[in-house]
Amino acid sequence: LVRLHILGDFPSVEYVAFWARMLNKFEFLNVYGYTARLSGTPIGDAILSLRSRRFMVRQSGQFNGDDMSALSFDDARSLPMVTAKKAIVCPTQIAKRDEYELAAKGIDTLTPNCGTCGLCWTTPKNIVFLTH
């Protein structure tokens, strides 16, 4: 499992094609991450065309569809998505709340870190981050 772009984003369509070649070459390679590249742009569309169970790259802030997006909780679209069960609040952040009670009293987190969770790279459901 490779987590892409902690400090950057996809710079080109050619770079997306590189990851397509790596996925074809290495059968057990899995990739996840986030991108600000939106659909309707060459890079965003290349990412969308590669998206699969082995290439779980979420688009940040674009909730046009029903899945594979990431959004901050302070965005007005996030609470309705969570309420309608179209999005999941990141389990490592469930107790970081403002006026909303997202966790049962006394629960700090549902899982201690991303490595013990895996929702970002195993579910197509939207993910909402309380702090991001």
How would you describe each model-predicted region?
Residues 1-132:
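Class I S-adenosyl-L-methionine
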